[in-house]
Amino acid sequence: MTEQIYVGNAAADAPAGRGWLLGHFQPDGDPRHSDDVEIKWAIHPPDDRRAQWVTGEQRSAALILISGRFRVELPGRSVLLAEQGDYVVFHGVSHSWHAEEASVVVAVRWPSLAGYALSPSDNGTSAVS
């Protein structure tokens, strides 16, 4: 029987998957494999940014600030996550982001779809989306 429980530490596990802990990209049979949702533990140094906007977005996302100061740029709106627990939810919206201070952010996206990854050179040092 395939193990249905996985116990880990987000900070320790995140580097192996560019921050992504759960999603379609985890191996079949791994309890962290899901076609329904993706979860990322993103650690951003100060001034980390993705200036390139995600375009053609069809997924939904929730970004939750654990620590730091993190700005999400959305069409016609800039959202600052400044206090622990601040979050933003958006559906099918193009976006970019900027870590104004060293920040830790949890990103939840749904559904988990292949084909959205940007190369690290296009994506800053640690992409949220």
Where are these regions (language model features)?
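Glycine- and acidic-residue-biased ligand/ion/polar-headgroup-sensing regions
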Residues: 58-71, 75
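Double-stranded beta-helix
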Residues: 5-6, 98-129
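A short, N-terminal "cap"/entry segment at the start of jelly-roll beta-barrel domains
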Residues: 1-46, 50-53, 122-129
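Structural motif
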Residues: 69, 94-96, 104
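Short histidine-centered beta-strand/loop micro-motifs
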Residues: 32-33, 50-57, 74, 80, ...
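Short acidic-glycine-tyrosine-enriched beta hairpin
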Residues: 76-94
